[in-house]
């Protein structure tokens, strides 16, 4: 008897979810991909033979660019959130929350070329709404709407983008961001430097390995465009093209500027003299300040003065060595007005682009060089459902931000009120990309992640009744200790040990008739430096168990 169409459809959906999971964890999915192709062929053949249509069948899978988070993944994200929240609170921040969808007009015109990635919702009751693209614009709307002049806030929440997803690199359509922003007036670069200090604290505390913070200033970049002769209406589109220099060689970026965006070739060549410059902040700053033509542009001169102050403060904060002054960093979002930055992890560059030399120094840029887009060989294991070879895509920036002084005033002005400027600066950490790095390390055995936070498993031996285990667990729960036990009335010892081992629970409380009669239990350490030498466990008086466990758990 042939497999039913519905069964085949269920198998395909299950395989699609399995392939997603394997790709996220950097495992080979070629076997599952081939199996899914065979099932799809079988499904087509079934329909040709007069089998039922699949149009009315339910496809059990998550939408493209989204994932279910299993216990281990959810717990790892919780760890990331907790680490970041602790740092934000240390810097005097309060948290807020905003709706996941905003009025469409609130988001319109804030994201430049990325506006096409906004999810628009169907009309509901006469209001046109869109899912939020980031947490920054809703924050500015919140500040303007409530007449706030000064606030330090952090916000952890989901955002949505109609991007081409690359699951293994944390590039999703639904993902978490963790934002820290300071709104309010300050002397030049005081808040900017603190936000960069917060960013470095966050990435160091997450222990994800080496990273670099690329930094630039919108006024310097706009000054370069002015010096080169870029028409005002082309400033943002050309800025967006420059921002691609971390992914494409100069020849390709120049082609986009001249062929696609209509920029004069001589103007593009002039831009090319500057955008290849990057390195330690003070060195690049000195080089730019010695450029008389650039210093003759007031906008650029002001930006360079800001950077001089910023680097001085970053040295005080002990994070200057993490910065790279990179003239190719542009950030495509329209609302930035001052410094801009992106944090790049050591694993960010995809293998195929690591072989392309970085953009050369200004004096040696060959603007006539041919395009050198890397070739990639696609395989079933690395090519996703959109035909993107995931092995050629890097993790990308793991955090980004900058100064945006006009956004709050823009909202206030749009309501007809007096446009009060509330200067703002902030940073956003991309949780999914940080998670993908930590998940890679976990798969390599560098990071251990559990699916539960249970601290003690109550194990009964020798026919100890369920009520005794319940009573003991209740005592631990009342003391705030995370505890579990077998739900069976008469569980077998091997099954109980297996449950404790499978969940990697660090301590087991062994309840046995002899010890209970003496008013004691045995506490055995399962995970940790003392576990190997703790074969039988330590006998502890029942009235002292809570204090003993809290001391072991570091909560004494």
Predicted regions and their residues:
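Positively charged, Gly/Ser-enriched RNA/tRNA-binding surfaces
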Residues: 76-91, 102-105, 135-147, 151, ...
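Glycine-rich, mobile lid/loop segments that gate access to catalytic sites or pores
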Residues: 213-224, 229
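Proline- and acidic/polar-enriched loop/turn elements at helix boundaries
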Residues: 34, 100-101, 215, 237, ...
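TRNA-binding/sensing appendages of the translation machinery
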Residues: 43-137, 145, 173, 188, ...
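Acidic, His- and aromatic-enriched active-site or binding-groove loops in soluble protein domains
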Residues: 116-126, 230-258, 345-349
């Amino acid at each position: 008897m042939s497999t039913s169409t519905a069964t085949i459809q269920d198998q395909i959906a299950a395989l699609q979810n399995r392939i997603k999971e394997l790709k996220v964890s950097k495992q080979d999915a070629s076997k599952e991909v081939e199996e899914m192709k065979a099932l799809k062929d079988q499904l087509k053949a079934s329909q040709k033979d007069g089998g039922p249509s699949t149009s009315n069948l339910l496809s059990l899978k998550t939408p493209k660019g989204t994932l279910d988070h299993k216990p281990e993944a959810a717990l790892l994200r919780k760890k990331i959130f907790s680490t970041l929240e602790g740092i934000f609170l240390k810097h005097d921040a309060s948290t807020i929350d905003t709706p996941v969808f905003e009025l469409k007009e609130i988001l319109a015109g804030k994201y430049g070329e990325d506006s096409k990635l906004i999810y628009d919702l169907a009309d509901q009751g006469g209001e046109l709404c869109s899912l939020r693209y980031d947490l920054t614009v809703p924050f500015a709307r919140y500040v303007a709407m409530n007449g706030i002049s000064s606030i330090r806030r952090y916000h952890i929440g989901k955002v949505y983008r109609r991007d081409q997803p690359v699951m293994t690199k944390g590039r999703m359509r639904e993902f978490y961001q963790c934002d820290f922003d300071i709104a309010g007036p300050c002397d030049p670069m005081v808040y900017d430097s603190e936000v960069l200090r917060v960013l470095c604290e966050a990435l160091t505390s997450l222990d994800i390995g080496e990273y670099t913070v690329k930094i630039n200033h919108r006024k310097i970049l706009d000054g370069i465009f002015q010096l080169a002769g870029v028409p005002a209406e082309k400033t943002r589109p050309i800025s967006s093209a420059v921002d691609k220099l971390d992914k494409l060689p100069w020849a390709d970026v120049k082609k986009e500027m001249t062929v696609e965006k209509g920029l004069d070739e001589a103007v593009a060549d002039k831009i090319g003299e500057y955008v290849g410059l990057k390195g330690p902040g003070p060195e690049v700053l000195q080089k730019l300040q010695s450029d008389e033509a650039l210093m003759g542009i007031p906008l650029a001169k002001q930006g360079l003065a800001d950077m001089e102050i910023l680097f001085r403060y970053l040295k005080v904060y002990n994070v200057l060595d993490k910065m790279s002054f990179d003239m190719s960093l542009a950030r495509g979002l329209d609302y930035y007005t001052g410094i801009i930055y992106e944090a790049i992890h050591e694993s960010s560059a995809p293998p195929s682009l690591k072989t392309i030399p970085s953009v050369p120094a200004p004096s040696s840029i060959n603007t006539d060089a041919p395009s050198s887009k890397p070739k990639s060989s696609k395989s079933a294991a690395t090519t996703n459902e959109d035909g993107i070879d995931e092995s050629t895509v890097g993790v990308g920036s793991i955090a980004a931000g900058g100064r945006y002084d006009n956004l709050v005033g823009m909202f206030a002005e749009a309501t007809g009120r007096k446009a009060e400027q509330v200067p703002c600066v902030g940073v956003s950490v991309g949780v999914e990309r940080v998670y993908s790095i930590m998940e890679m390390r976990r798969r390599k055995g560098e990071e251990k992640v559990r699916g539960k936070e249970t601290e003690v498993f109550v194990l009964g031996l020798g026919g100890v009744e369920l009520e005794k285990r319940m009573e003991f667990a209740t005592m631990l729960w009342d003391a705030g200790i995370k505890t579990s036990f077998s739900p069976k009335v008469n569980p077998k010892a091997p099954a109980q040990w297996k449950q404790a081992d499978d969940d990697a629970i660090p301590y087991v409380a062994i309840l046995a008739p002899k010890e209970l009669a003496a008013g004691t239990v045995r506490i055995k350490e399962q995970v940790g430096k003392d576990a190997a030498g703790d074969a039988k466990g330590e006998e502890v008086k029942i009235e002292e168990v809570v204090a003993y466990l809290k001391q072991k758990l570091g909560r004494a």
